[in-house]
A protein has these predicted regions:
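Surface-exposed, hydrophilic segments of mature proteins
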Residues: 1-158
Length: 158
């Protein structure tokens, strides 16, 4: 199933900034109170637009993606979308176990249980911002990442 989900970042502050987004995605129990580590987070498929955003592959895991907006996000400005949809892998429906029970009268009851019953997916996006003044050093200090900042302000990851 595909879910239209449009995610972008708005700079509601008063200074221009560089921003990064950390997207965590995982499965939780039915009420969302406990993370389900027995379920595969890669079944949650996030469509990243790559429109002005670059992913830090070194920081990625099966549950986390880290993206950097490659331009300065000016005060009051909204970035291009970094996510435009989320879907669940259709193979999920194939993950089922069946048990059969034969009653005293000879009838057989077959019960199907899907592995992902009573689970929900969780997507959390956290935004961090860094000043544009001495950006390279500020980003290294705040985020621990080596970047290049070109004369026009464009950011790239080393």
């Amino acid at each position: 199933k595909k879910y239209d989900e449009q995610l972008a970042v708005k700079n509601s502050g008063t200074i221009d900034q560089y921003v990064r987004v950390t997207v965590n995605h995982y499965w939780a129990d039915e009420d969302g109170s406990k993370k389900r580590t027995d379920l595969d987070p890669s079944m949650i498929q996030i469509h990243f637009t790559n429109d002005g955003w670059v992913e830090d592959g070194a920081a990625a895991s099966t549950e986390r993606n880290v993206l950097y907006y490659t331009s300065v996000l000016s005060s009051g400005q909204t970035s291009p979308l970094f996510v435009d949809s989320i879907s669940i892998n259709s193979d999920l429906a194939k993950l089922v176990s069946q048990t059969s029970t034969t009653n005293d009268d000879g009838t057989t009851t077959i019960e199907s249980t899907f592995l992902y019953d009573d689970a929900q997916f969780v997507l959390e996006a956290t935004v961090d911002a860094v000043q544009t003044h001495n950006a390279k050093e500020a980003i290294k200090s705040a985020w621990g990442v080596d970047v290049n900042v070109s004369d026009d302000g464009s950011l790239s990851i080393n």
